[in-house]
Structures are given as C-alpha cells and as structure tokens.
C-alpha cells in the first residue's frame, strides 16, 4: 500500500494533471484536497484532451474512486457542467464523490471577487475572478455555505435571508453593483442541489475506510507551493494551502498515513497573474517558451509569464513539502535552445542568498544568479528511457537534481500520457538517489 501526495513545486501549472493521471493507474482513490475552479488540469489521452477544473484527474480510470474533499470550494454550476461534459465524452462519473463539508461558491462571491480586483487598480493580485478568495474568506468568517446546507432546503433558505442582505450592502454601497434577490439565488442553488445530491457523502469517512482496507490513495493538489496562502509569495497567492500539509487538513486524514510526497516542476518556470518572478524572460526566449509550451491558463486563458528554471524556489518547495522525489515536465519545450540557464541563487540588495526570502518586497528586488548549460538541439518527445535522451538533456536533469538535492523519478517529454520517462517507480521504488543524486 502507498498513500501519495502530488504537489506543485512552483507557481502552479506544472503539469500535475498529467502526472496524477499517470499515477492514477495504480490508485484506488484520488482525492482533490484544496482549491476550486480557479485551477485547471489538462490530460491528453491519445487524440483526446480533457480539461478538468475541480474533478480529480483519476476520473479517466473507470474503477478509480474520485473525491472532491472538504478543503475544496465547490461552484455547483461549473461542477455540473464539468460532469455533463465528461459524460458526453463517454467518461462515467459514477465513482465521483463530493464532501458534504466542502464550502460552496455563491453568486456574490464571484461579483465581489471581480469588483474587488478592479478596485485594487495597480495593486491588483491577479485573481481568476472565480470567487475563490471570497468563498474561503466566508469560510474563515463562519458565514459560508457548505454542500450539506444545500441538501437542507428550509435551512438553506433561512440562512440566505440573512446572508444575502449583508452581501447586498457590499455590492451596492462599496462596488456600485445591483443587489441579488434571495428568491432567485434560492431557486437556482436548490436546483443545483438536487442534481448534486447523488454525489454527496461524508468524504473523510470514505477516505478513512480506504486507509483501513489498505487501498492506494493519491492526494492531488491544485496550484503550487509558491501560491500557498501561508508559504507562498504573499499577498500574490491563492486562498488555500496547496502544500503537502494541506492534503491532511483538506482531506481529513492524519499525517502518519502519508507514505510519499511527489513534487511536480516544469523544466523552466511559469507564473500567471501578478507578483515577483526573478527569472522572468521578456525577450524572444520567453516568447519561445510560451509558444512552444502552449502557456495559456486552462481556467482563464491568460498567457503565462515564462522564465528560466529557478532552483531557489525549487529547494524551498522541497523543504516546505518534504518532497521524496520530483517529476520534471515539459523537458521537450527546451529542445531547440542553444543554451539554458538555471537560477541557483539571488543577488538581493545587500547580499547573495541561496534561500527563498519570505518578504515579497525583498523578493521583488532580487536578481537571479545563473549557471548556463548547453542545450541539446534535438527532439526528445520520442524518448521513453533516460538512455534515449540526448546526453546534454541528461546532464541538465542531473544538474536540476543536484541543485534541488532531490531525486527525479519521472520526466515528461510531451503532453500525451505515453510521453513519459519513468526513471524509477515514484510510488513503490526505494527512496534513493536517481539520476546520480546521492543527497550530498
């Protein structure tokens, strides 16, 4: 048995969907433990491309149980659209379950999210405008709705009658927006509730039963370490905890059941939205990475900012998550480059540092210290073993493993499921050096 967490080691969009899909073949249960529809996972199987937002990537395996856990926030309208879309493609959702204690994104959450971002002006954060932050804010403020509230029509309407007027004060007086009608919200959400009812369960109990019966459980995070509310580049972060520790809280399990933590990182770095990004490239190389890597957000369609691999934030992700091994994705995007840079430290205003600074203002003034490696100038998309990779591509991976002080278990060389090099079984293999890294 192995219970594994898959976590993003950068600013999200690392390719966790593909890695989770790949690992789901040996998982009995896949659990999405935090976030909402602000995340997007793209999985390519043969000629089909699946873009998922809230439903775990394991849904593509008919016998795998998929859980949307308590730590997530659920937009009923979008979730139902996602379910319908999968079923139209012939993908069954009979093994999909939604935690009754997950919080619900309401219409006013979206309105407030968009209006507040506009009000911030030049201080905007870069939110997706999907209402995620306001939903988590109401959760913390104890004024939120949970999925189980939707299942109780009388109590739901009663709560709406005192919450909606409060939100209308904000909408009308602060944001100059029209008020919401209680009747309209109630009718809309109670209709959603009836459609979602067959999926709603006590998710923590289901997960506990899976643990007790020695099932393989895969915990799937959204976003990435540097977007974590507590450990990311605050305030340019999400409103939940994508780090490995968030899996235990979001899923309702104890840390002692976790066997492995796998970090996913691109062979370069991307970021969506605002915030410091030391290795960002605003030149032809940056444009090449964006075009070759199809760097557009699955959820928003916004172009991602692109830059060189940052080993400083990588080491930070290793430390914060306790990573056992890494999956490096999109190596093939670098195939045509003459030379490739890796950030190994930062020049801060007064000194050179090799560790990530917590202060976003200081981080914004850091300049990258690079080491330059030769490119390999040949395609890698056909490679299925390390030996088939160009020697300089292997050298690059060795360098990343050494800088991160963490072994690499998987290498992705294309979007499709089969375009993956399995260096060593990331779930059942021994925790030892891969690609020559020995922990020194």
Swiss-Prot record:
Which residues take part in binding Mg(2+)?
Answer: 13, 40
Cofactor: how bound: Binds 1 Mg(2+) ion per subunit.
Which species is listed as the source?
Gloeobacter violaceus (strain ATCC 29082 / PCC 7421)
Work out whether the entry's keyword set contains Aminoacyl-tRNA synthetase: no
Q: In which pathway does it act?
A: Purine metabolism; AMP biosynthesis via de novo pathway; AMP from IMP: step 1/2
**Main subcellular localisation:** cytoplasm
Task: Report keywords, A-Z.
Answer: Cytoplasm, GTP-binding, Ligase, Magnesium, Metal-binding, Nucleotide-binding, Purine biosynthesis
Q: What class of enzyme is it?
A: ligase
Database matches in CDD domains: AdSS
Q: Per its Swiss-Prot or TrEMBL entry, what cofactor is needed?
A: Mg(2+)
**Which PROSITE patterns does this entry report, sorted A to Z?**
ADENYLOSUCCIN_SYN_1 (PS01266), ADENYLOSUCCIN_SYN_2 (PS00513)
Pfam families linked: Adenylsucc_synt
UniProt entry tagged with the keyword Manganese:
no
Record-listed substrate binding positions: 298-304
Catalytic activity of the protein: IMP + L-aspartate + GTP = N(6)-(1,2-dicarboxyethyl)-AMP + GDP + phosphate + 2 H(+)
Q: How is this protein organized at the quaternary level? A: Homodimer.
Which SUPFAM superfamilies does the protein's record reference? P-loop containing nucleoside triphosphate hydrolases (SSF52540)
Q: Name the family.
A: Belongs to the adenylosuccinate synthetase family.
Please name the catalytic residues of this protein.
13 (proton acceptor), 41 (proton donor)
GO CC, any one term? cytoplasm
Annotated protein name in UniProt: Adenylosuccinate synthetase
- Single GO MF annotation: GTP binding
